[in-house]
A protein has these predicted regions:
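Class I SAM-dependent transferase core
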Residues: 25-63
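Conserved Class I SAM-dependent methyltransferase catalytic core
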Residues: 45, 49, 170-226
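Conserved class I S-adenosyl-L-methionine
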Residues: 65-74
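Conserved SAM-binding loop of SAM-dependent methyltransferases across substrates and taxa
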Residues: 75-88
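Conserved SAM-binding loop
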Residues: 104-105
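Mobile active-site "lid"/loop adjacent to the S-adenosyl-L-methionine
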Residues: 146-175
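SAM/dcSAM-binding transferase cores
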Residues: 225-275
Length: 275
């Protein structure tokens, strides 16, 4: 069994948190998100947070007082972005890599966001989640950005961490959705992002235990196929599936879409976030 390590970040412990062991400074960058409202330290190479994490956060239907669990949080980008938009959530960041988890812990403290950081493999099993305080029916909202690149079409990176963060196995999505179903309360909310050409995999994974799906396709522009899908699902939901109008990252002229820019700057949310 994989032993989980959990630590709670107090927003007042910035100096102590900053002194914790991290990768060498030369290997780390500090980047601004949400128009500078969120500052994140992350590895210069390997898996780096970007637009996917912020779009996922903007699609997450969290409310003040909710227990929100970010599975595979990396350095905390998506979960911390949710906490910046929705004050008063009880945030848990779950990450398998100890170095990324430590960066997530420090990022939470540096941004004065209270968060619990758990070092745990999402596919570790129910007992490990119980040990980490993530028992069945204990979360109101789960968000996830699982590894989603198809290994048959994606050249594996020599960087093991990068490969694990980006390349899915045949069971990755189903396993992560199973975890979300177990830890969510009845009528709990799941938000996820996946590659658009894998929509059939998403629908199959959500077929058991989830309903009331809302799907938002993300396109580079109006002339291109969707590159991502953002999906919201409800544990035990029974409402019909809704397909939203496409989210265009760029106008036909190549100019960035103003609404998307507002969302990325932390000035708005996506329709899936409303409940």
């Amino acid at each position: 069994m994989i032993k989980a390590f959990s630590s709670e970040v107090d927003p007042g412990s910035r100096e102590e948190s900053a002194s914790k062991k991290q990768p060498a400074a030369a290997e780390i960058t500090e980047d601004g998100f949400l128009g500078g409202q969120l500052r994140l330290r992350q590895p210069k190479s390997g898996h780096r947070a970007g637009h996917d994490a912020i779009l996922l956060a903007a699609a997450t239907p969290a409310r003040s007082g909710d227990r929100v669990v970010d599975l595979g949080s990396g350095v905390g980008a998506a979960g911390l972005a949710v906490a910046r938009r929705v004050r008063g959530i009880d945030l848990v960041l779950v990450e398998i890599d100890p170095d990324l988890a430590e960066l997530a812990r420090n990022n939470a403290a540096a941004n004065a966001i209270k968060a619990e950081v758990v070092i745990l493999d999402v596919e570790a099993g129910a007992a490990a989640f119980d040990d980490a305080g993530l028992a069945p029916d204990s979360a109101d909202v789960v968000l996830m950005n699982p590894p989603f690149n198809d290994p048959s079409r994606h050249r594996a990176s020599p960087d093991g961490v990068r490969q694990r963060a980006h390349v899915a196995t045949a069971t990755t999505l189903a396993a992560w959705v199973h975890v979300a179903r177990r830890i969510l309360r009845s009528n709990g909310q799941l938000a996820l992002i996946w590659r658009a050409d894998g929509i059939a995999e998403v629908l199959a994974a959500l077929d058991r235990g989830f309903g009331s799906l809302e799907i938002l396709p993300v396109h580079g522009d109006a002339t291109a196929p969707a590159i991502r899908i953002l999906v919201r699902a409800v544990k035990g939901g029974r409402a019909p599936t809704r397909l939203h109008a496409a989210l265009l990252l760029n106008e036909e002229s190549g100019v960035p879409n103003k609404w998307v820019q507002e969302v990325l700057a932390g000035k708005g949310e996506l329709p899936l976030a409303r409940r």
